[in-house]
């Protein structure tokens, strides 16, 4: 089954998130559990959560993906910034315990001239404190484009974080197609090679989701500018190969393209037609 969704709003609640996803022929959805700029999250409404659970129990929607606020930086040089990131992360994980089958995706962070090794140490230290044995949510490290001092451009950097996690069974990876292409992995001309490299360094069992985005800029550009499907430098042929690849096709895919809800519906219809 092709599991495809898009980044949608929870401003009208979680049940509405599921209903809106189904209305655009999606069977999963990504959302911000709070403002992408941080701040307090709205209190959970149990009836609303129950509505989402019932919807997921009775449809093909099996999993949802929460995306951490962009401001989170567990690798920051500033202790205040790290503490704020930790508090948001911890609160989000506690809230997600109350939601149906879900994962929590985050940008690993930027080391801000401290060096990659120090940044990796700070991230893994925080994750070891955040991860609980009774936690239901799987935490996903996202592949990054390599802007500035971002950590996570290379598979080696992500693996260096994961190998330091005590309860690493609760940690996975989300590949962003725009990010890895901008970061230097040629998924257009050598998708098999990139997948094999990921498998040899991290392991395909860690790959839990894919952000399916075209890229406004070219290979190794380190720009991180998403483009609509088929309108960027990755192109429709490579995207078709990605969604149909035998090692990727059963993963959940999430659109983060520059679109409104109707635009997402058009892309989902297009991709469903290309899925074989």
From Swiss-Prot:
Protein name from the UniProt record: Probable endonuclease 4
What broad class of enzyme is this? hydrolase
Q: Tell me, in a sentence or two, what this protein's role is.
A: Endonuclease IV plays a role in DNA repair. It cleaves phosphodiester bonds at apurinic or apyrimidinic (AP) sites, generating a 3'-hydroxyl group and a 5'-terminal sugar phosphate.
- Domain of life, per UniProt, equals Archaea
Question: What positions does the entry give for Zn(2+) 3 binding?
Answer: 179, 224, 226
Give the family, as the similarity comment puts it: Belongs to the AP endonuclease 2 family.
GO molecular function: any one?
A: phosphoric diester hydrolase activity
Q: Where does Zn(2+) 2 bind?
A: 142, 176, 211, 256
**According to its UniProt record, what is one Pfam family this protein matches?**
AP_endonuc_2
Residues annotated for Zn(2+) 1 binding in this entry = 67, 107, 142
């Amino acid at each position: 089954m092709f599991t495809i969704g898009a980044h949608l709003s929870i401003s009208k609640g979680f049940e509405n998130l599921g209903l809106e996803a189904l209305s655009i022929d999606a069977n999963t959805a990504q959302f911000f559990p709070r403002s992408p700029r941080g701040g307090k999250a709205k209190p959970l409404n149990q009836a609303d959560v129950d509505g989402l659970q019932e919807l997921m129990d009775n449809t093909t929607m099996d999993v949802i993906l929460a995306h951490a606020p962009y401001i989170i930086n567990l690798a920051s040089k500033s202790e205040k910034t790290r503490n704020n990131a930790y508090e948001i992360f911890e609160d989000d994980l506690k809230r997600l315990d109350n939601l149906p089958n879900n994962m929590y995706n985050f940008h690993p962070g930027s080391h801000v001239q401290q060096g990659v090794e120090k940044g990796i140490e700070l991230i893994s230290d925080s994750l070891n404190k955040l991860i609980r044995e009774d936690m239901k949510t799987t935490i996903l490290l996202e592949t990054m484009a390599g802007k500035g001092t971002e950590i996570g451009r290379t598979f080696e950097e992500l693996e260096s974080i994961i190998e330091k996690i005590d309860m690493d069974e609760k940690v996975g990876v989300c590949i962003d197609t725009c990010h890895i292409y901008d970061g230097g992995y040629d998924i257009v001309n050598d998708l098999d090679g990139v997948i094999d490299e990921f498998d040899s360094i991290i392991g395909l069992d860690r790959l839990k989701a894919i952000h399916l985005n075209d890229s406004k800029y070219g290979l190794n550009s380190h720009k991180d500018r998403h483009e609509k499907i088929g309108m960027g430098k990755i192109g429709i042929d490579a995207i078709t190969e990605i969604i149909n690849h035998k090692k990727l096709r059963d993963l959940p895919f999430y659109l983060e393209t520059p679109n409104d809800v109707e635009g997402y519906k058009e892309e989902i219809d297009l991709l469903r037609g290309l899925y074989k």
